[in-house]
């Protein structure tokens, strides 16, 4: 009985990586270095993003002309797929051959 208790004593109950009594995962030196590097990159990104390239006045409407031209190009491409307009006067013009009163 004491031998069984001794052999089963150091075991983690259930799944060893999840749950209330899980095995603790120790942080390695490489994991610390990776975390420090990622935090430094994030701090640099925050620094560069905190200083805008353009002022609010410059930024407002700076792409309006380009967007309008792109929209006009899309609209022209869409309308070019349609056939030209056909009018009833042109379709029925052959019936006007025998008009006597004009």
From Swiss-Prot:
* UniProt GO cellular component terms: mitochondrial inner membrane; mitochondrial large ribosomal subunit; mitochondrial ribosome; mitochondrion
Its GO biological process terms? mitochondrial translation
Q: Name one GO molecular function term.
A: structural constituent of ribosome
Do you know which InterPro entries this protein is assigned to? Answer: Ribosomal_mL63
The entry's localization annotation reads: Mitochondrion
Query: Does DNA-binding count among this protein's keywords?
Result: no
Q: Name one Pfam family in it.
A: MRP-63
Give the record's keywords alphabetically: Mitochondrion, Ribonucleoprotein, Ribosomal protein
Please give the chief subcellular localization of this protein: mitochondrion
What PANTHER family does the record point to? LARGE RIBOSOMAL SUBUNIT PROTEIN ML63 (PTHR14520:SF4), MITOCHONDRIAL RIBOSOMAL PROTEIN 63 (PTHR14520)
Family in the record:
Belongs to the mitochondrion-specific ribosomal protein mL63 family.
Oligomeric state and interaction partners are given as: Component of the mitochondrial large ribosomal subunit (mt-LSU). Mature mammalian 55S mitochondrial ribosomes consist of a small (28S) and a large (39S) subunit. The 28S small subunit contains a 12S ribosomal RNA (12S mt-rRNA) and 30 different proteins. The 39S large subunit contains a 16S rRNA (16S mt-rRNA), a copy of mitochondrial valine transfer RNA (mt-tRNA(Val)), which plays an integral structural role, and 52 different proteins.
Q: Which named protein is this?
A: Large ribosomal subunit protein mL63
Annotated source species: Homo sapiens (Human)
């Amino acid at each position: 009985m004491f031998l069984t208790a001794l052999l089963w004593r150091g075991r983690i109950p259930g799944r060893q990586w999840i749950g209330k009594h899980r095995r603790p995962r120790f942080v390695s030196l490489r994991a610390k270095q990776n975390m420090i590097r990622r935090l430094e990159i994030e701090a640099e990104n925050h620094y560069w993003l905190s200083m805008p390239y353009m002022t609010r006045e410059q930024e407002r409407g700076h792409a309006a002309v380009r967007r309008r031209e792109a929209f006009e190009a899309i609209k022209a491409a869409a309308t070019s797929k349609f056939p030209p307009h056909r009018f009833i006067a042109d379709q029925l013009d052959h019936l006007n051959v025998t008009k006597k009163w004009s």
